[in-house]
Amino acid sequence: MSELLSFALFLASVLIYAWKAGRNTWWFAATLTVLGLFVVLNITLFASDYFTGDGINDAVLYTLTNSLTGAGVSKYILPGIGIVLGLTAVFGALGWILRRRRHHPHHFGYSLLALLLALGSVDASPAFRQITELVKSQSRDGDPDFAAYYKEPSKTIPDPKLNLVYIYGESLERTYFDNEAFPDLTPELGALKNEGLDFSHTQQLPGTDYTIAGMVASQCGIPLFAPFEGNASASVSSFFPQNICLGDILKNSGYQNYFVQGANLRFAGKDVFLKSHGFDHLYGSEELKSVVADPHYRNDWGFYDDTVLDEAWKKFEELSRSSQRFSLFTLTVDTHHPDGFISRTCNRKKYDFDGKPNQSFSAVSCSQENIAAFINKIKASPWFKDTVIVVSSDHLAMNNTAWKYLNKQDRNNLFFVIRGDKPQQETLAVKRNTMDNGATVLDILGGDNYLGLGRSSLSGQSMSEIFLNIKEKTLAWKPDIIRLWKFPKEMKEFTIDQQKNMIAFSGSHFRLPLLLRVSDKRVEPLPESEYSAPLRFQLADFAPRDNFVWVDRCYKMAQLWAPELALSTDWCVSQGQLGGQQIVQHVDKTTWQGKTAFKDTVIDMARYKGNVDTLKIVDNDIRYKADSFIFNVAGAPEEVKQFSGISRPESWGRWSNAQLGDEVKIEYKHPLPKKFDLVITAKAYGNNASRPIPVRVGNEEQTLVLGNEVTTTTLHFDNPTDADTLVIVPPEPVSTNEGNILGHSPRKLGIGMVEIKVVEREG
């Protein structure tokens, strides 16, 4: 209803101003600004909805505020371009409509009415309400009743008798199991759900609506709210260090805790969270690649579900035979938005809906088949009688190709339990939320029936039942939950450990690289991760007087304040204010001690603008002074005009990437020498090894042959035509995810370049 009212007010404002208000520059600018704000708010809501399926929420702040890196970014380029073009067109059209009667005399009353209607349209819009609520949640002091509802359970289970298998289905919400809405979509796993304890009303709350947040909520009984931008969780050394979570209780009770997934464990800090709370055995893409049958069988995120669940079954067998009490947690990935992935072993590879194939539904149908097969193996084993199997979604599906159909239904998270010791078949319709999952499992295993804000759905009362406004209540508790981190509020001295790539201050430890915004009462860490922009782009968003400490590779800050370090890949520390003074210090010891040194200086806005502009230069446009092209740092030598077909810098150099161009092209600003030696230090990838690799300058072509290890080769060129471009053509680029950023489409690698040098020959 508010959407219709908001749009009606917007339309009325446009029509009244366009046809009645007349000419006045101030009123035109004010009305256009407010109407433009309405447009921007609603496009923001649309864009956020595209990713989260739930509008502008904490997931937007957590994972999508800085960049889309790692999110299968290529799938979002067209929608992003469409939004920008649409916004430009709407603003242009809006300005043209409002100025239609600019030659008529100004009418104060109609101008005021149009402006008030425009303000009303903004106030009534759902986007404005959602943003307002998020802002309020950032600034609240907390709720005095938090301590009454947050309860720490006993640290042990008195007499544990059951092993635990806990399966997180990526985005596998219960809505998919509605056979009337989606016929025969989940027959195998749906049948198993109906055989167990099925909790049909598991609500999603703020701070529980993405994978790591859903895991924290289900294991610790609290939403994931943090005293820093959410992706910093990948950089911290401990995760809610003072809290007692399910993994801690299991470990204290004699369980060996295992976690298996197909993606990289570092993504979003899952490794940090699990290690902080009782898990000593973790398996992700890096750990599995040496043990799986086919290490090259991967999707954009890691190993397919059939591979992961096969490894989980092997681990279940091994642990069951050992007679050691254990828990085995696993997380699938094939149903990840926006499209999902289809494992090759599935019988159900295609699902048609609305008269056409739907990739997300197909991925769901395939993944549930794999999960059901895993569960049926356990049920058929002699160890099932000692096992509790839990299946839950980590969160509701985000905006995938099935989302518009899901959104027509009453949406709930999946949570059901199959007990080998005591079979129970029942659908329980109690109101509950993800935070109740851990408490319910703990209750079944013989422990307490509460865990944080979670309560057992078998013997307790959920916060969702106690509070009708549970979403608002959860946000009111946000400051109280943030305080559970015990995060430092000041930074005076710090230590950098080069061996561990860590920085420590005030009792907290973070992985490098790291950017910190330091104020009198708050220290905010901003990491560089799969879902965040490079640190220099984040620093460019700082205000002129914001104090910062930036720890990164020297070459990344050298172009601004230390050109002598432009080719150094060592660690450096920069601190200061973008509009004031900055210093750069080279970390020259294994354990390096530093102090913050912020000075109150006069802010120079010209200096600030220059720093921001330099920070925002994209990698390929950076230039440095050197007599060769060094590939393990960003940019190129000053002599290079442009280059293409080359991937991002890595610690050793850069790969050619046929996704960016079939050839490696390096165009110089001036013609190459008449006679020169081309000294190439490089290696080949896969089938490109021991193959002739054409290297061209103008009309002359030489052949380069490389192995899988780095070697240096010198080629001799004559350049009578004054050509200015070097071209290298890898013969057989290989599509692979090796060394790739999580969630990105595979690269097509050919040769790995360490250094290329042009040496002029006499004569």
UniProtKB/Swiss-Prot annotation:
Recorded GO molecular functions are: phosphatidylglycerol-membrane-oligosaccharide glycerophosphotransferase activity
InterPro entries per UniProt: Alkaline_phosphatase_core_sf, DUF7024, OpgB, OpgB/LTA_synthase_biosynth, Sulfatase_N
Q: Which domain of life is it from?
A: Bacteria
- Topological type in the membrane: Multi-pass membrane protein
Provide the transmembrane region boundaries.
Answer: 1-21, 26-46, 77-97, 108-128
EC code? 2.7.8.20
Which pathway does UniProt place it in?
Answer: Glycan metabolism; osmoregulated periplasmic glucan (OPG) biosynthesis
EC top class, in one word?
transferase
Which CDD domains does this chain map to? LTA_synthase
* Cellular-component GO terms for this entry: plasma membrane
Localization:
Cell inner membrane
Reaction catalysed by this enzyme: a phosphatidylglycerol + a membrane-derived-oligosaccharide D-glucose = a 1,2-diacyl-sn-glycerol + a membrane-derived-oligosaccharide 6-(glycerophospho)-D-glucose
Q: PANTHER family of this UniProt entry?
A: LIPOTEICHOIC ACID SYNTHASE, PHOSPHOGLYCEROL TRANSFERASE I
NCBIfam families according to UniProt: PRK03776.1
Physiological role: Transfers a phosphoglycerol residue from phosphatidylglycerol to the membrane-bound nascent glucan backbones.
Similarity-based family: Belongs to the OpgB family.
Q: What is this protein called?
A: Phosphoglycerol transferase I
**Organism in which the protein naturally occurs:** Escherichia coli (strain 55989 / EAEC)
